[in-house]
Amino acid sequence: MSDDTEWSEDILNRLNVRDQYEKKDSRYFKAFSQLSQEARTNDQASNNDKSIEYNKLLKENNQLKKDNEILTTSLNQTTISLEKSDLKINQLLKSQDQLERHNTSLNNKIKHLNLEIIEKNKSVEILNDELLLNEIQTNVLNDKITRLSDENKKLVERWIEKAKSDAEKLNDANEFLESVNRK
């Protein structure tokens, strides 16, 4: 918003400078008009041909003044248009600079995120390798537990069989001793 007010103030200041500059020359135009009027009155008295030439010059002078005013107006409009264009260019350059900085920032962020993804992928690979190793170890341990359970079961069965056998032998020995003691 301040750029618009600065721009408007700048235009008004330039127009004031131009108007002051033209006002300096207005006394010359007035002096010229007075001289031309004096010349006309002198010429009318002395010579009618000079009067025609004077009128011609006066018309030409008036036409030149009108042309000058038209050119001045056109110059002012062109100056205003040029200043608007300059302002727009400056705004676009600022916007472009901001966008370039934002783009650079986003590119840096993308690079950092890509590096982070690479590191996370490495970590995931390591975790997958460790998980696979743990699964292998678990399978080996489960196999060992199964084998040891089977072996333990067989040992218990063998021990029970041996205990049965020993108990039967003991029973037989006790029966024998009892039968010997009875006799």
From Swiss-Prot:
GO terms for cellular component: phagophore assembly site membrane. It is found in: Preautophagosomal structure membrane. Disulfide bonds: none annotated. GO terms for biological process: autophagy; protein transport. Pfam families: ATG16 (PF08614). Residues 44-183 form a coiled coil. It is a peripheral membrane protein. Keywords: Autophagy, Coiled coil, Membrane, Protein transport, Transport. Its main location: membrane. InterPro entries: Autophagy-rel_prot_16_dom. The keyword tRNA-binding does not apply. It comes from the Eukaryota. Stabilizes the ATG5-ATG12 conjugate which is necessary for autophagy. The ATG5-ATG12/ATG16 complex is required for efficient promotion of ATG8-conjugation to phosphatidylethanolamine and ATG8 localization to the pre-autophagosomal structure (PAS). Also recruits ATG3 to the PAS. Involved in endoplasmic reticulum-specific autophagic process and is essential for the survival of cells subjected to severe ER stress. Homodimer. Part of the ATG5-ATG12/ATG16 complex. Several units of each may be present in this complex. Belongs to the ATG16 family. This is Autophagy protein 16. The gene is ATG16.
